UniProtKB/Swiss-Prot annotation:
Species, as recorded: Listeria monocytogenes serotype 4a (strain HCC23)
HAMAP family per the UniProt record, alphabetical: RNase_P
Quaternary assembly: Consists of a catalytic RNA component (M1 or rnpB) and a protein subunit.
Full protein name: Ribonuclease P protein component
SUPFAM superfamilies given in the database record: Ribosomal protein S5 domain 2-like (SSF54211)
Gene name of the record: rnpA
Length: 119
């Protein structure tokens, strides 16, 4: 995922926190805010030091970014997303992270339904 599609600035994070909607499961909290006219979604990641050391935190962030990259065609391009990882995410492999993100995005109704004949 290109860096221009990431949320980095504190003001951008605060805007999504204040105006956006949130939904969660045991592993992740997702905040979403609709941005009219945007051609591509942006994501911001937050993984607390409580979750583990730098290696563990960076692994979780890589897994989340890769999951969004693979789900790119199903995700609404007019939204900004902030994903906050919770403690149970520390012990998950990539496939579990992706499955959990799919679940929480479906709960928030921001994931388009995948056609039955494609993988």
């Amino acid at each position: 995922m290109k860096k221009k599609y990431r949320i980095k600035k504190n003001d951008d994070f605060q805007k999504v926190f204040r105006r956006g909607k949130s939904f969660a499961n045991r592993q992740f909290v997702v905040y979403t805010l609709k941005q009219e006219g945007s051609t591509h979604f942006r994501i911001g990641l937050s993984v607390s030091k409580k979750i583990g050391n730098a290696v563990c935190r960076n692994r979780i962030k890589r897994y989340i970014r890769q999951s969004f990259h693979e789900l790119e065609s199903q995700i609404n391009p007019e939204n900004e997303y902030i994903i906050i990882a919770r403690k149970p995410a520390a012990n998950m492999d990539f496939h579990e992270v992706k499955k959990s993100l799919i679940h929480v995005l479906k709960v928030g109704r921001v994931l388009k339904q995948k056609p039955n004949n494609s993988k």
